[in-house]
Amino acid sequence: MATVSMRDMLKAGVHFGHQTRYWNPKMKPFIFGARNKVHIINLEKTVPMFNEALAELSKISSRKGKILFVGTKRAASEAVKEAANSCDQFFVNHRWLGGMLTNWKTVRQSIKRLKDLETQSQDGTFDKLTKKEALMRTRELEKLENSLGGIKDMGGLPDALFVIDADHEHIAIKEANNLGIPVFAIVDTNSDPDGVDFVIPGNDDAIRAVSLYLNAVAATVREGRSQDLAAQAEESFVEAE
């Protein structure tokens, strides 16, 4: 299983928190101290907590669980999309629309509209429209793709959320809490860890740190999925005997 060492974390700057004046006192157990008015995260805590989270994500994916990656701030957006795609999972990387999980029925209708528009754009329907109507539909398609493109094939609620920046994505976390969906999140020194089932104390801004988390999670999910496939192959082999 993919694991991350303290050396990897130090190189990526995982230990740099936010300025001390922005801290959330609930993060005190995970803070080592302060340097130049910036909190330093205690990696002695982060390393085992992250590896524990990876072990649990591996279990979920080995049971065919769906993982939803959430990271909508600009620094994380592209990396979140790439990581989710690399392990055939799902993502929200632009704006979290209120009710994305708790109002899944409505979201499903919007996904249907997105897929209809995709078909129309490919089967020549757009070409038969007036220029203005075609432009309006193209804009609608782009808007829906931005918001829902990463979850259009999810086919139902996810089995876990992996969140970059618990503070920024507090609405997503609250919705997952309401539905009993486990939340794995990177929690910086300015964030509230409440509502996060698997807290990973760490820098949520530096792109190197964000990439480190995402690559490790994606590799873990791929491994978990391959365990599931190996188990399936073994079962069918036994049946064939």
Curated annotation (Swiss-Prot):
Entry's Gene Ontology molecular function annotations: structural constituent of ribosome
Pfam assignment, any one: Ribosomal_S2
GO CC terms of this entry: cytosolic small ribosomal subunit
GO biological process annotation, one example: translation
Position of the signal peptide: none
Keyword entries, A-Z: Ribonucleoprotein, Ribosomal protein
Family: Belongs to the universal ribosomal protein uS2 family.
PANTHER family: 30S RIBOSOMAL PROTEIN S2 PROKARYOTIC AND ORGANELLAR, SMALL RIBOSOMAL SUBUNIT PROTEIN US2M
Name of this protein: Small ribosomal subunit protein uS2
Annotated organism of origin: Cronobacter sakazakii (strain ATCC BAA-894) (Enterobacter sakazakii)
